[in-house]
């Protein structure tokens, strides 16, 4: 049985797919990624690399599994991000028994404040486009939805 989408309305969007959650989520992701990538590119990082670096700088010794859960990324993606950051000399892995722990190097710790500044610059651009309150509410709704979808997997 097909479920009708109550959001379907010619005025709802300029796209005929504007009532599709998958389409809307990807359109939003592309739009904010353009903003985020531009800011983090100044540091030679993608936004995913920047978030991972920030995590291990703020909370040293996390496992790749914990990073995967925190950043909503697959374990294989986390491994690729760690490898790239290792190549840049920004993080290091340390075996501990059967686990592997990830730490920011001294160079990673030095770069972490610039990552935080880029993060703030991105937020300012998002809030300027949407309005502060709408940006806060949208962020909360997106994270809540991501957590629900992750729990359902």
Regions found by a protein language model. Name each.
Residues 83-143:
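Charged, amphipathic alpha-helical coiled-coil/dimerization segments
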Residues 1-15, 117, 132-153:
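C-terminal regulatory/oligomerization modules of transcriptional regulators
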Residues 64:
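Helix-turn-helix DNA-binding elements, focusing on the entry/boundary residues of the two helices
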Residues 28, 32-35, 39, 71, ...:
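Alpha-helical linker/hinge and terminal dimerization helices associated
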Residues 1-43, 101-103, 110:
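N-terminal leader segment of winged-helix/HTH proteins
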Residues 60-61, 72:
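Central "turn" residue of the DNA-binding helix-turn-helix
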Residues 55, 70:
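Residues within the alpha-helical elements of helix-turn-helix
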Residues 19-23, 43-54, 79:
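Short alpha-helical elements of helix-turn-helix
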């Amino acid at each position: 049985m097909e479920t009708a989408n109550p959001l379907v309305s010619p005025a709802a969007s300029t796209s005929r797919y504007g009532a599709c959650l998958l389409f809307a989520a990807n359109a939003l992701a592309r739009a904010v990624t353009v903003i985020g990538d531009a800011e983090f590119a100044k540091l030679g990082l993608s936004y995913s690399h920047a978030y991972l670096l920030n995590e291990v700088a703020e909370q040293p010794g996390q496992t790749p599994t914990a990073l995967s859960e925190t950043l909503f990324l697959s374990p294989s993606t986390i491994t690729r991000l760690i490898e790239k950051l290792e190549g840049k000399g920004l993080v290091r892995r340390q075996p501990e028994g059967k686990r592997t722990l990830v730490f920011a190097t001294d160079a990673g710790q030095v770069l972490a404040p610039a990552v935080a500044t880029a993060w703030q610059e991105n937020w300012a651009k998002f809030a300027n486009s949407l309005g502060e309150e709408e940006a806060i509410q949208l962020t909360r709704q997106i994270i809540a939805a991501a957590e629900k979808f992750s729990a359902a997997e």
